[in-house]
Design a protein with these regions (language model features):
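Bacterial N-terminal signal peptides that target proteins for export
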Residues: 1-8
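Primary mode marks residue(s) on the alpha4-beta5-alpha5 output face of response regulator receiver
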Residues: 23-52, 59-177
Length: 177
């Protein structure tokens, strides 16, 4: 009996620090891009890639850059964990499970908006029938962005595309506390 109690106590000691570490890794963000109550952090990945912009004519006939799609690799430390791409934006795990933007993203300016793309809260849904690690993801936050803004100079020709390098940290959330 005492041996079982010791095993349970040891398990609790080992679990509580892990739970508090997961909780402490949830970032502080502007309230408008906070994840709704009742959701928990599942994954955190660093993204490295480009934001692809395309030259289009605006309503006044001038050329502007418009975001076409992201193209990035997701990393868990040094391990490639997936990809972020397409329009509407999609995130695909190494196991083939995939989520896609399912509603309007909510945006908040990055701390240095002149250099860095905004922070986002994106509702997502499963995009495939593949059961995998993204199967239960319902929100993704894009935070800690660096770079990625459209070029400062106006485009010269309709249809021109350019990739603007960026980095970000993506936080994946599922239902449950």
């Amino acid at each position: 009996m005492n041996r079982n109690l010791c095993v349970v106590a040891l398990a609790l000691i080992l679990l509580f620090p892990a739970a508090s570490m997961a909780q402490s890794s949830v970032p502080d963000v502007p309230s408008k891009i906070s994840v709704p109550a009742g959701h928990r952090l599942l994954f955190k990945y660093e993204a490295r890639g480009v934001q692809i912009y395309k030259a289009v004519k605006n309503q006044s006939g001038k050329l502007d850059w418009t975001l076409e799609a992201p193209l990035a690799n997701l990393f868990d430390g040094d391990r490639e964990a997936g990809h972020h791409y397409d329009s509407p934006p999609s995130w695909e795990a190494a196991d083939g499970s995939k989520v896609t933007k399912s509603g309007d993203a909510i945006s908040a300016p990055a701390p240095d908006p002149e250099k860095d793309i905004p922070w986002l809260l994106v509702p997502v849904k499963a995009a495939t029938d593949e059961v995998g690690i993204y199967s239960t993801v319902v929100f993704i936050q894009r935070l800690q962005t660096a770079g990625g803004n459209a070029p400062a100079s106006a485009p010269k020709r309709v249809g021109t595309k350019v990739g603007s390098p960026y980095r970000a940290v993506y936080y994946f959330y599922g239902a449950g506390s």
